[in-house]
A protein has these predicted regions:
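Short, surface-exposed beta-strand-loop junctions and turns on beta-sheet-rich folds
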Residues: 41, 45, 102, 121-124
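Short, positionally conserved secondary-structure boundary motifs
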Residues: 1-64, 69, 142-151
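Structural motif
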Residues: 78-79, 92
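Short, hydrophobic/aromatic-rich segments at coil-to-beta transitions
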Residues: 60, 89-93
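Glycine- and charge-enriched low-complexity intrinsically disordered segments
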Residues: 110-151
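Short, well-ordered loop/turn sites that connect or cap secondary structure elements
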Residues: 74, 86-88
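Short, compositionally biased
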Residues: 68-71, 92-114
Length: 151
């Protein structure tokens, strides 16, 4: 039986295409928030964002944040790199479905066995019981945020 993943209004699924050439960018050693040192002004290495964030494409999802329930940590249109091969830990942010509901982004509280929104304006939390069907799409591994508006 084919199972379709349904997201709620706070998430949008983005497919990952892994074919094609990788692009590399030069990484400079650190960025000082104070006064820079001339000794630190050298090239470090080249990286591929594919290799950093898509090292296991078969276990990686990208979701776009919609809504404000996880603000201020997550903003509208942020991209989440979600890994389905990570074991969920206390305090992780997860994409999850409870009792066949739409998938949503929430923080996991292992101690109190609940999922909750971090925005204080969204007091909604879900207590998880033994009877609940919990389907974890994955754990948020990284966040991509555009700082400038697209032209």
């Amino acid at each position: 039986m084919m199972k379709f993943i349904k997201f709620d209004e706070t998430l949008e699924f983005l497919p990952i295409k892994t074919e094609g050439n990788k692009k590399y960018v030069v990484v400079r050693e650190g960025v000082n928030a104070g006064f820079p040192s001339p000794a630190e002004d050298f090239l470090n290495d080249r990286i591929s964002l594919d290799e950093c964030y898509l090292s296991k494409p078969e276990a990686t999802f990208i979701n776009r944040v919609k809504g404000q329930s996880m603000y201020p940590e997550y903003h509208e249109n942020d991209l989440l790199i979600v890994r389905s091969d990570y074991e969920v830990q206390h305090g992780d942010d997860v994409v999850v479905s409870i009792n066949r509901s739409a998938y949503t982004l929430k923080r996991y509280d292992k101690i109190q066995s609940k999922l909750y929104a971090i925005n204080p304006n969204y007091a909604h939390s879900v207590n998880i019981t033994e009877e609940d069907e919990v389907i974890l799409l994955g754990v948020v591994d990284a966040l991509v945020r555009n700082r400038k508006r697209k032209k």
